[in-house]
Amino acid sequence: MPYILLDCDKFIPERMKHTYVYDPEENILPACNTNTVPGDMTERGCAFAGSRGVVGGPIKDAIHMVHGPIGCAYYTWGTRRALSDNEFHRRYCFCTDMQESDIVYGGEKTLEKASLEVMEEFPEASGTFIYTTCPTALIGDNVDAIARNIEKATKKPAIAINSPGFCGVSQSKGHHVFNMTFYKWLKLKRKEFPEKCMPEEEKTPYDVALIGDYNMDWDVAVIKPLLEKIGCRYVTTFTGNASLDELFQLMDVKLNIVHCQRSAEYIAQMINDGFDIPYTRATFFGLSDIAESLYDVAKALDLPKERVDQVIKEEMEAIQPKLDYYKSKLEGKTCMVYVGGPRTWHWIKAMKDLGVEYVAACCTFSHTDDYEKMNKNFKEAGIKDILVIDAPNEPELEEAVKTLDPDFMLVGLKERYLFRKYGVPTINSHSYEEGPYAGYRGFVNFARDVYKAVCHPVWNVLKEGEDKFKNFKGDLNE
């Protein structure tokens, strides 16, 4: 089926290239990762949010300094539930709080003073990440020089991340910038501090690192035991609940396992190119994808398949009774998904595992390869006629909900409030309701939260209330 133009987009015909209905007989990929059309009420985030809010922020023992107005610090605290076991991580927000005078006269002195004060207040911090924002990048503050000054004064690492909000079309650019900057910095510092690298005598043929997991509601605490059960030695995570020192060992493992394939595959590719360490892609959401990922890891490390079979059997036996109950309640329900990038296609087989029908997939910052994977998963799951929208705006989302009338939606942090007003149950599949959602036990948590949202009696009350006002609404329309 060709691309389609939604009714709400008649004044922005360019949006037609971003919207299609999946058909296995057609090879359609939408326009994506492009500049937002003026007048389009986009839901995208900025590049700064991608670097600070997504990839960098979960590093648990470093100071994350936002060099910009206090409004930019919204993305630093109380948004994504990237949890850690560090006492000050996520409890504090560090920002230079740029004022008009700083914009006029420059903010470098303000940045250096604030960073040194924070390091004095928190001597346990391992180092400092400094993130530029739109105003500080536009006035040309030399944050790289300030980072060098801070490093010299504190004798601890200071890393400048130059990803102001305007430097890319979406938060995806911020992911890329952080990956590249951190890789270059780490490669240099490993030579400077060889004692932080893993000693040769400690290395094993089964060392792995998890790339692109940010420990939402302790996902890492579920994934790590799974990998260890099949025979891996878990070394570190990029970046969920990881310390700066632990990340020095990213280049010492035998295999990198890439979970979020949009925000962190960049660094896995660079490590592969620079250190000849292979990587494999994995999805730890949904029964089918978890099993496939475990087999892929075992194959890459030459681990016995029988061990993986046994682990899967044990995990399934532990969750089957609860899973059967939730599946019986959700069978035949319809779901619309609106998330950032990879999770749009991560959830395809997971929905099928629950007996849920997937009716629409909307992505904020997906690239071409994300849509290729999405179409592949649709085909493997045997489903078609799915509405797909790249970087949807608010009217498009409203029209999709009104047209498709899904039983529930998987959404992110900010969209759920709009759709709940429409009477559509929502589940936060971005930062979770009550996770973890990864792994077998996490999938039961996910099924439980979907069940609690969809089957909550409040929706019946709302529908009864709507029925009472039908005649009244009809009179008004006439």
Swiss-Prot record:
Signal peptide: none annotated. Its cofactor is [8Fe-7S] cluster; [7Fe-Mo-9S-C-homocitryl] cluster. It catalyses: N2 + 8 reduced [2Fe-2S]-[ferredoxin] + 16 ATP + 16 H2O = H2 + 8 oxidized [2Fe-2S]-[ferredoxin] + 2 NH4(+) + 16 ADP + 16 phosphate + 6 H(+). It comes from the Archaea. It holds the Pfam family Oxidored_nitro. It is an enzyme of class 1 (oxidoreductase). SUPFAM superfamilies: Helical backbone' metal receptor (SSF53807). This is Nitrogenase molybdenum-iron protein alpha chain.
